[in-house]
Amino acid sequence: MRLDHWIKQFFIVPGIICAALLAKENFVPENFFANIFEGFIATCLIASANYVINEYLDAEFDKHHPTKKFRAAVKETMSGKIIFLLWLALTILGLSIAALVNKYFFAMTAWLWLMGIFYNVKPIRTKDIAYLDVLTESVNNMIRLLMGWFIIIKALTPPRAVSYSAIGCSAHF
């Protein structure tokens, strides 16, 4: 589940800050802290689902990597059925919690999950395509920023300035 990588999910914080500072209407103060907590947990669970499938699909290749070869997913034989059930459970739980926040946050969470599929699973597997691998990971940062926005705001689109900074954020990572 790569809990050590949950720190990356803090990329939702700039979106939360932008939403809190720029929102005049559609602000959700009554659920402010609950939405942030649920949003962060949902984001971490979806990221974990993506890491689980990544670790499983890359285990054979990672055996030859100088540092990745020491990971448990590489050193131990994993049952495909158990991995699939863990991935499915993390996905369902993450998306279910995301749905508690609001429909826009749910859509962004589903998009982050889908990007994990595109990145890891054939026939697309952008991880194996030069430039698309980095682009896919960069788009994930934009998605996280938008997830932060939608944790706070129940509006279809953030202001253009936030949208442009999300694109810039994505281009620089």
Where do the protein language model's features map onto the residues?
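Acidic (Asp/Glu-rich) catalytic motifs at the cytosolic membrane interface
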Residues: 43-74, 123-136, 173
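Membrane-helix interfacial "entry" motifs
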Residues: 27-35, 68, 79, 101, ...
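Topogenic membrane-insertion module of multi-pass membrane proteins
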Residues: 1-59, 63, 76-89
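Lipid-exposed faces of alpha-helical membrane segments in multi-pass integral membrane proteins
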Residues: 7-14, 37, 41, 45, ...
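Helix-coil boundary and interhelical linker segments in multi-pass alpha-helical membrane proteins
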Residues: 17-41, 93-107, 145-167
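Interhelical loop and helix-boundary elements at the membrane-water interface
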Residues: 2-8, 72-84, 119-142
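Multi-pass membrane catalytic core of lipid/isoprenoid biosynthesis enzymes
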Residues: 59, 64-110, 159-169
